[in-house]
């Protein structure tokens, strides 16, 4: 299992976990940012798994924002909106919307 795959799996275990401390959940957000920086290094399966976990976090946005909000003020986040996980409060209240758009891989012939 690659280092990225391990990190994706750990992230996936965290998106539904409200039993851990909010500090550990903030670590999940940092982990997701690290994965975003390496997104071009991920293979297709890793990207799909990451997308699946992202969708679960979006589904849990309200509860996770409340959980993390015990120690983190989302309104002070300076992260770009492209890193929406740092803005779960806005995701939860519908101020950030998502659109699925296809991308053609560079080595695929049309």
Locate each region found by the language model.
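Long, contiguous secondary-structure blocks with strong helical propensity
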Residues: 24-36, 100-104
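N-terminal, helix-rich and Lys/Arg-enriched segments in bacterial and organellar proteins
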Residues: 8, 12, 32, 43, ...
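Acidic, low-complexity, intrinsically disordered interaction modules
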Residues: 28, 36-79, 83-85
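Short terminal alpha-helical segments
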Residues: 1-29
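Amphipathic alpha-helical binding modules
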Residues: 68-110
